[in-house]
From Swiss-Prot:
Coiled coil: none annotated. It comes from the Viruses. Changing R133H: In strain: Isolate variant XX. NCBIfam families: dCTP_deam. Belongs to the dUTPase family. SUPFAM superfamilies: dUTPase-like. It catalyses: dUTP + H2O = dUMP + diphosphate + H(+). This is Probable deoxyuridine 5'-triphosphate nucleotidohydrolase. This enzyme is involved in nucleotide metabolism: it produces dUMP, the immediate precursor of thymidine nucleotides and it decreases the intracellular concentration of dUTP so that uracil cannot be incorporated into DNA. It does probably not deaminate dCTP.
Length: 158
């Protein structure tokens, strides 16, 4: 079942869903918009974090971004990450991304550049999370290697 804005507010008030910081205006009809954090990593041979208020995503470039918000999902909620249409209309892409029940942390999202340079600003709403409730709480909530991550987190070996 997809959560409505009312459901999302109920989950937030009961602490079953935590989004910090949370702006009331980011709670949408059927999801929550998340903002770009202030870190980026360009995926190339020498991957270094860049910290700033603005970033240019160059044509066909692959980057990792982080969300400004730290989230925590209870063991009966998952989230689907979608790029807001404003950015998709500029030609940017993200791969299908699911946030598992029990996840806690800032999200690291891969973004693929357009055919033209695109400027991103820290604090811009760029992701739309759609929350869904599982029929029953999961037996084994997420407790993987990216649990409680902060900032852009590079791939970790298994």
């Amino acid at each position: 079942m997809i959560l409505s804005d009312r459901d999302i507010k109920t989950y937030i008030n009961s602490k079953k869903l935590v989004i910090n910081p949370l702006s009331e205006d980011t709670i949408r009809e059927n999801g929550v918009d998340l903002k770009i954090g202030n870190e980026i990593v360009r995926i190339k041979e020498n991957m270094e974090k860049e910290v700033g208020d603005e970033f240019i995503i160059y044509p066909n470039e692959h980057v990792l971004l982080t969300t400004k918000e730290y989230i925590k999902l209870s063991n009966d909620i998952i989230a689907f990450c979608n790029l807001r249409s404003t950015f998709a209309r500029k030609g940017l892409l993200i791969p299908p991304t699911i946030v598992d029940a029990g996840f806690e942390g800032q999200l690291t999202i891969e973004l693929v550049g357009s055919s033209i340079p695109v400027k991103l600003k820290s604090g811009e709403r760029f992701l739309h999370l759609i929350f869904a409730r599982t029929l029953t709480p999961v037996e084994k909530p997420y407790n993987g290697k990216y649990q409680k991550q902060k900032g852009v987190t590079l791939a970790k070996e298994d």
